[in-house]
């Protein structure tokens, strides 16, 4: 896990709506999302950071060994990079992003558990 991917402060954190990676707004804008950058294109794009992340999330998980972790399997994170992840993320992706993901063959499962 690169130390620059770990949030430096607990205030103002956001979670990716696709993979639930938690970082600061500035970190998403500077580096994008390590798991989803290919199709979310958040790097150097404030609008995409706002559209594809949420500041409304519950719980956090520090994931250091995604392939060996039962928590990673439970949260569907085992194929993602090491980092800090939200347990539940509230928010919806733009329809254009959902269409793009579908066209790329990426199955989207909402990480919003607030209605359960």
From Swiss-Prot:
CDD domains associated with the record: Spt4
Pfam families with a match to the protein in the record: Spt4
Chain spans, region Interaction with Spt5: 1-40
Compartments it resides in: Nucleus
Source domain of life: Eukaryota
Record's keyword terms, sorted: Activator, Metal-binding, Nucleus, Repressor, Transcription, Transcription regulation, Zinc, Zinc-finger
MF-aspect GO terms: protein heterodimerization activity; zinc ion binding
Zinc finger regions, C4-type: 16-36
Any one GO cellular component localisation term in the record: polytene chromosome interband
GO BP terms in the entry: negative regulation of DNA-templated transcription, elongation; negative regulation of transcription by RNA polymerase II; positive regulation of DNA-templated transcription, elongation; positive regulation of transcription by RNA polymerase II; transcription elongation by RNA polymerase II; transcription elongation-coupled chromatin remodeling
InterPro entries associated with the record: RPABC4/Spt4, Spt4, Spt4/RpoE2_Znf, Spt4_sf
Summary of subunit composition and partner proteins: Interacts with Spt5 to form DSIF. DSIF interacts with TRX, RNA polymerase II and with the FACT complex, which is composed of DRE4/SPT16 and SSRP/SSRP1. DSIF can also interact with the exosome, a complex with 3'-5' exoribonuclease activity which is composed of at least Csl4, Dis3, Mtr3, Rrp4, Rrp6, Rrp40, Rrp42, Rrp46 and Ski6. DSIF may also interact with the positive transcription elongation factor b complex (P-TEFb complex), which is composed of Cdk9 and cyclin-T (CycT).
Protein name: Transcription elongation factor SPT4
Organism: Drosophila melanogaster
Classification of source organism: Eukaryota, Metazoa, Ecdysozoa, Arthropoda, Hexapoda
Gene responsible for this protein: spt4
